[in-house]
Design a protein with these regions (language model features):
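Catalytic cores of peptidoglycan-degrading enzymes
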Residues: 24-151
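Polar/charged, compositionally biased leader and regulatory segments
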Residues: 1-38
Length: 151
């Protein structure tokens, strides 16, 4: 059920125009895990990391990196409390492991608008924000959008 909900959200395409393509960082905090890093769990190799992790204290505010519409909210086994934001033209952000969600389904959020607070819900080893960006259902490195991409 969780995977099906999230897949539908990633496949959503709205005609709205993205408000900006250079995004703001959604949270202040150091990068703790980059995009694409190969992961291991109990000695087993897993899929590469599909987003950026930012270390931050529990309760740190999370801001919308660009304007968007809340298209999915959930509390999932792996991702914990999660918000999906549709920026338009197939560009979707996912914010995971929140301690609090401060938006509702269908809300229009301005760039810099408050989404929720950093937490460690779901499968997390400590408080952090996992931020994932998808373009037409393909995961892309969010660092590209915040001017921090390093090939």
């Amino acid at each position: 059920r969780e995977l099906a909900e999230q897949t539908r959200a990633y496949q959503q395409f709205s005609p709205r125009q993205p408000s900006n393509l250079l995004f703001d960082r959604p949270v202040n905090g150091p990068l703790s895990s980059p995009f694409g890093l190969r992961r291991f769990f109990n000695g087993e190799e897993r899929n590469p990391h599909s987003g950026l992790d930012f270390a931050a204290n529990r309760g740190t505010p999370i801001k919308a990196p660009a304007a968007g519409k809340v298209i999915l909210i959930g509390d999932y086994f792996f991702n914990g409390k999660t918000v999906f934001l549709d920026h338009g033209q197939g560009l979707i952000s996912m914010f995971c492991h929140l301690s609090e969600i401060d938006v509702q389904l269908g809300d229009e959020i301005a760039r810099g608008g408050h989404i929720g607070k950093v937490g460690a819900t779901g499968r997390a080893t400590g408080p952090h924000l996992h931020w994932n960006v998808s373009l037409n259902d393909a995961r892309v490195d969010p660092a590209i959008f915040i001017g921090a991409f390093k090939p």
